[in-house]
Amino acid sequence: MYNKKRKAIFFDIDGTLLASGEGIHESVRDALKKVRNHGHQIFIATGRAWCCLPEELQDVKLDGLIASAGSDIWFHGQNVYRQSLSPDLIEHTCQILKEMDAVYLLEGFDRIYVSEKAQRILLGKEVLPNDNPELVRWKKYFRQKPNLYPIEEWTPDGEKVPKITFMLFQKEQVEKVKEIMSEHFHVVFFPAAYDDFWNGELISRRADKGTAIQKAAELLHIGIEDTIAFGDSMNDYEMIEKAGCGVVMANGDEYLKTIADRICESVQEDGVVRELERMHLI
């Protein structure tokens, strides 16, 4: 049934199109191009800021982009929606994270501001006793980004910030962050592969990927039932829940799978490509 009407298809990047430590497979890039050539609309829906999209996607023609976990929406090359955190909330949150000795980053629309500890660990030469492979991956990622700036350069009347990313190194801090931050943010933790490193996101309660795909459907003049979403983590929850068909990767969060309409193969197995084939969209 999926090939009978024009669909709007939304793809998360990390863990969905892109495996940790790998580039985007050529088969995935080809599939995205085929979907669009068949008359469907394709969108990227990512937690990343728009300035941090992978180079491998730059030659794939998109109909739109949902960036910063729903806080930044682009449609046919035009920015149609942006919302950011209040400067007071940012300053208050930074103080709490600093007191917790966390690594944290202010993800602006055009620049990313990194805390003092992030500068030492992610951009410097400091090696922690618990420098696990996941942390090494973060280091490699951030050292490739030219738009990183010391947090001291951020000012309340300067760069707008829609999202804060953080990393913790003590398990007891995970629940503490949820307790303190949940009043003002969607608090998203990613599955912990190691017991000494947790990374997460603080996203405005006024934004999520689900609300963003609803806005995109309205711009396209299609019903939400004609949307399909692919994701793997809890910042995809609202998108998977709201889409006409929500597809979760086999490598995805176990709780997210409980609300999925479909579960496809893992990102390493080109699950997106296989599911698009089963849906007769390519």
Label the predicted regions.
Residues Y2-A8, H25, N199-I282:
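Mg2+-dependent phosphoryl-transfer enzymes with acidic/Ser/Thr/Gly-rich catalytic loops
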Residues G21-D131:
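Active-site phosphate-binding/coordination module
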Residues N37-F43, L62, P162-K163, E225-D226, ...:
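Short active-site oxyanion
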Residues V60-K61, A69, M100, M181-H184, ...:
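Short, structured coil segments at secondary-structure junctions
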Residues L62-A69, V187-F189, G246-N251, C264-S266:
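Short hydrophobic/aromatic-enriched beta-strand-loop microsegments
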Residues R111-I228:
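Conserved acidic, metal-coordinating active-site core of Asp-based
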